A protein has these predicted regions:
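Basic, polyanion-binding surface patches
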Residues: 1-90, 94-176
Length: 176
């Protein structure tokens, strides 16, 4: 199963990067598979620590995709990284293995600490559609335009029916 998350990693100078990622989880391990090239890939190769953040706020995914990465963070407890203050929960991880691949290598990461940060308040269908639109936007070079437009048209149904003001603004941003 793929779980949508926000990975926070940093380079050796401490510059933090926020990236939306579909990760895989098994027991006390998390598998992160970034495409070449990516800042997350670079950071995890040189700094073995990161956090995997779980949020129900689709606006975070949109802002990451659009490069508006000004989020409140706190220091992790068990590694030299940060986590999203507004996330529902997060896992603090350490890279224990690098599995090489020409297109999409994998970092096998051990979970050092898991924390619950905020209460889950329920599911809004518009958020799911917005996250799916972000995934489509990140794959513009890989997918046919017609497929993307058809998917967005379908996803817009849930946004139109169920979104609040914040979700509608995020939807409009991702569709610009």
């Amino acid at each position: 199963m793929i779980i949508e998350s926000i990975i926070i990693s940093s380079d050796l100078s401490g510059l933090v990067n926020f990236a939306p990622f579909g990760i895989k989880k098994k027991d006390d391990l998390i598998f992160i598979s970034p495409y070449f090239p990516s800042k997350t890939l670079e950071n995890l190769q040189i700094n073995k620590y990161a956090s995997v953040n779980y949020t129900d706020q689709a606006t975070v995914f949109v802002d990451c995709l659009l490069g508006k990465k000004k989020f409140k963070t706190n220091q992790c407890k068990k590694n030299n990284s940060f986590f999203l203050q507004d996330s529902l929960s997060h896992d603090e991880v350490e890279v224990v293995e690098y599995i090489h691949d020409e297109v999409r290598p994998t970092f096998r990461c051990k979970i050092l600490n898991s924390s619950i940060n905020n209460r889950f308040k329920g599911i809004n269908r518009a958020n799911n559609s917005i996250i799916e639109a972000c995934i489509l936007a990140s794959r513009v070079k890989l997918l046919e335009k017609e497929k993307i437009f058809n998917e967005l048209k379908y996803l817009s149904i849930a946004v139109e029916k169920t979104s609040g003001e914040k979700e509608l603004q995020a939807w409009n941003k991702i569709n610009e």
